[in-house]
């Protein structure tokens, strides 16, 4: 038998009939319609809004009032401003190791980021994990170069 659009049928059991609630005891969902006896959840206009906790201050309104929530996947950097790089000589290479030797960074736990605060008077080759736009412009304007290091 060939199937045409007017002879197509859905498989039996694939489409469930909608329950007609409140249409008599014989219908199986009469009287209280499966909502129980009394209470807010059995009334008309039933569902409360998402996040409603029965009048108690809901979680989504409590949380911002509490302090010290840690930012998930926060990027931390060991930061240093451009004005500190004036301690180096012309054509020096600035990286985490050289900054530790100079005493500008003590314990390099995090990747290095160069910030653009202050003036730079020295031509340097700076190797860091991140630069601000202003820092990159100032280093290149002083004749230096910026090299990005990959995080491993």
Curated annotation (Swiss-Prot):
Compositionally biased tracts (Gly residues): 25-37
Basic residues bias spans: 14-23
Keywords associated with the record: Ribonucleoprotein, Ribosomal protein, RNA-binding, rRNA-binding
GO molecular function: rRNA binding; structural constituent of ribosome
Keyword rRNA-binding: yes
Domain of life per record: Bacteria
Swiss-Prot/TrEMBL GO biological process terms: translation
SUPFAM superfamilies with a match to the protein in the record: Ribosomal proteins L15p and L18e
Alphabetized Pfam families for the sequence: Ribosomal_L27A (PF00828)
Keyword Nucleotide-binding annotated: no
Residues covered by region (Disordered): 1-57
GO cellular component, as recorded: cytosolic large ribosomal subunit
UniProt record similarity statement: Belongs to the universal ribosomal protein uL15 family.
Complex formation: Part of the 50S ribosomal subunit.
Functional description taken from the UniProt entry: Binds to the 23S rRNA.
Full protein name: Large ribosomal subunit protein uL15
Gene: rplO
């Amino acid at each position: 038998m060939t199937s045409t659009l007017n002879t197509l049928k859905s498989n039996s059991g694939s489409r469930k009939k909608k329950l007609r609630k409140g249409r008599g005891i014989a219908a199986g969902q009469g009287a209280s319609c499966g909502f129980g006896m009394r209470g807010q959840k059995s009334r008309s206009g039933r569902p409360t809004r998402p996040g409603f906790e029965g009048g108690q201050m809901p979680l989504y309104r409590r949380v911002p009032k509490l302090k010290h929530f840690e930012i998930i996947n926060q990027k931390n950097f060991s930061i240093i401003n451009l004005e500190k790089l004036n301690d180096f000589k012309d054509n020096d290479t600035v990286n985490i190791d050289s900054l530790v030797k100079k005493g500008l960074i003590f314990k390099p736990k995090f990747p290095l980021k160069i910030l653009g605060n202050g003036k730079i008077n020295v031509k340097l080759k700076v190797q860091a994990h991140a630069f601000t736009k202003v820092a990159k412009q100032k280093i290149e304007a002083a004749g230096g170069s910026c090299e990005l290091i990959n995080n491993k």
